[in-house]
Amino acid sequence: MKQICLALVLVGTWILFTFCSFSQGTNIQKPIQYTLKSDFFLSTSSLPFWHYANQYNLTPKQQHFTSITQIYLNIDYQKDSLKKHTHLLGWGSEVNGIVQKSLSNKLKIVFPDFFLKLRLGSLEFWGGRRREIYGFVGDTTLTSGSFSWSSNAFPIPKIQINTLGFIDVPFTNSLLQIHATFAHGWLDTLAVDYGARVNTVKGYLHQKTLYIKIGRPSWRVNLYGGFNHQAQWGGENQIWPDGLPPKEAWWAVVIGKPWQGSRVGNHLGTLDLGMIWKLSDDKSLTFFRQNIFDDGSLYNFLNIKDGLQGVTFRNRSTPNYTRTFTLEKINLEWLNTTSQGGDVFDFQQQIFGRDNYFNHYVYPQGWSYKNEMIGTPFIPKQSDILNPLPTVKNLMTINNRVQVVHLGASGWIDEWKWLIKASFSSNLGTYDYPFPTPLKQFSGLLQIQKELPLLQGIDWTTSIAFDSGLLYEPSLGIQLGLRKRGFF
């Protein structure tokens, strides 16, 4: 009941703010985009991998039957959002309420998107929860998931300043463009597995990114490069005697300052390289590589073998329904995390192996939020893995040395839109707890979607997903969904 009341208060506040803005004498004309969506999931055991992975932790994976109803309202920037400053100022807002219900759980209401954004020229300021992905990939829909920040966990509340996409570097005539972000976020209470002073602390997130684009819009080839850096921190003055106060700890996190034989906080991210090659006006190839860093091993290129790489073909031409088959996009990726800088970690000798991705020696929940991995879903938490494998206390994952081949594709057959995902992985465990033999796993998804003309623009979606292998419980699942979009 409290959740329902809170949901009504939040939505009511958003609507009141929106319509009060409309009532001002500035002739603001900002159409509200809405989406109404309802999905039903049914499976033979727990949900198959591709019915819950990269879904922002919105589909309960341990349930045989789940229904999810979504109400999405969005006001985006408009050129007339402020009459006197057409190109300088603007505002927008978004609220996305989701109602979850399964056979064994009570009704649950969550808000994965609830934020207000303000624009000042080429800069954007926003605060709240917002669905995002960080890291250069060929396609955010077909990807296996960006390594450090995919769409796998529930959005983290943040305040952020960023550029509105790529913006021109002055005096380069669009030859150089940059895209940058800087954010502070609030994590849940973090458990502590270090020392004996405290058991829990308040957790925070630091995040920054910087990407550079080389090449003018008219060029056939554009090059990309940059990084994303995340850090999980908090409680430094509580965990360690004479520890850093919060302000000093925050600055040490921002600059990656060495401290207490390591660094303040749990740091990770990727250094990314990419290239977009325009084959024609409506077709392109994207090549990308994410190089992983986690405690300094990339500095000496010890873990250079690890990373996510791939190629994406994109066909932007308008679907021709007179054709039987149209390929829209195809994405092929290879993820490797087996090196981790080698089997040796020696801080004095500056040998930074055993990166132990997504685990941490101070914060046992590792790189996770609300009990779900923030990064790639192919490094799973312990509870997702089959029970015969041993449970290790104070480790978020016992399988962070993986190799994955992933294929995603989408297109049209007549007026039916289709999408497939197929992923094969070899799972080695961790350096400290290796599996006796590599565990093989296959996960697949086939989805079809069609607009129903008799129902005024309602889309119907059906998907079938299945898991087969030794890492997850074998499962077969089906999803049925309806979606209505429009403006008012």
Where in the sequence are the language-model features?
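Extracellular loop and loop/strand-boundary signature of outer-membrane beta-barrel proteins
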Residues: 53-59, 96-101, 143-149, 192-198, ...
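Short loop/turn motifs that connect adjacent beta-strands in outer-membrane beta-barrel proteins
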Residues: 25-34, 75-91, 119-126, 166-179, ...
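C-terminal structural cap/anchor segments
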Residues: 341-429
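Outer-membrane beta-barrel "beta-signal"
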Residues: 158, 473-488
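Solvent-exposed loop/turn segments connecting transmembrane beta-strands
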Residues: 63-65, 99-109, 293-301, 398-402, ...
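Transmembrane beta-barrel strands of outer-membrane/channel proteins
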Residues: 32-48, 89-99, 118, 125-131, ...
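Beta-barrel outer-membrane channel/assembly domains of diderm bacteria
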Residues: 21-132, 141-142, 147-149, 153-166, ...
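Signature for the C-terminal beta-barrel architecture of outer-membrane proteins
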Residues: 162-347, 351, 405-407, 424-430, ...
